[in-house]
């Protein structure tokens, strides 16, 4: 019996088998959780439903949801409530900024509209999901989980306004933890090392970032979606019942280093 047996989880943000959300879904399924999913638009519906079936779910537990639209978020929980009488876990794996914001000098390329979009989709949407799912999760010792990156606290080439949005997201983790803790709901984030996903492909020179990270991380390798998925499943389980408001780094130790190995090491 897995450590998530009996838990019900809504996973928001599965886009491909290579996405971090997929790694989390696979780990949660392995550990016995019952899963529901959202998809952004009709173009992704068939793909997400196919993935869901592989993780023990079914099409009626896959719901349309553009996280920029509060009415769609509320509709997800209204529909989910017809199938489940409660919810234990929400996984938020959503991040977006216009492509022109992720290419070039931060001061030069950042715009008011790009800033707004990045924060709305990448940070506020987590709060919106928590707000809409609050009643279904109340009193169940449940967990909210989101995904961040070290660019929230350190500058990264071309990450630009997404770094600011992730910083906002991490602050949201702490404030949500304070807001929902008395109801038994924990809130945490996994800060993953760079992984080749669809979202990451929009960042200029991402392959160079991967190579640099591999050289400089203590483990001398990049992490996988399976490793991030395992950490996410743990944080959402009763094994982590005393952890809330935290950012868990799954980056091979990169966040602990000030200087990577020298060329002659």
Curated annotation (Swiss-Prot):
InterPro entries found in the cross-reference section: Enoyl-ACP_Rdtase_NADH (IPR014358), NAD(P)-bd_dom_sf (IPR036291), SDR_fam (IPR002347)
Keywords: Fatty acid biosynthesis, Fatty acid metabolism, Lipid biosynthesis, Lipid metabolism, NAD, Oxidoreductase
GO biological process: fatty acid elongation
Record-listed NAD(+) binding positions: 13, 19-20, 40, 66-67, 94, 166, 195-199
Binding residues for substrate: 97
SUPFAM superfamilies: NAD(P)-binding Rossmann-fold domains
Pathway given in the UniProt record: Lipid metabolism; fatty acid biosynthesis
Residues the record marks as active site: 149 (proton acceptor), 159 (proton acceptor)
Record site feature (Involved in acyl-ACP binding), residues: 204, 207-208
EC number: 1.3.1.9
Family from the record: Belongs to the short-chain dehydrogenases/reductases (SDR) family. FabI subfamily.
Oligomeric and partner information: Homotetramer.
Purpose: Catalyzes the reduction of a carbon-carbon double bond in an enoyl moiety that is covalently linked to an acyl carrier protein (ACP). Involved in the elongation cycle of fatty acid which are used in the lipid metabolism.
Protein name: Enoyl-[acyl-carrier-protein] reductase [NADH] FabI
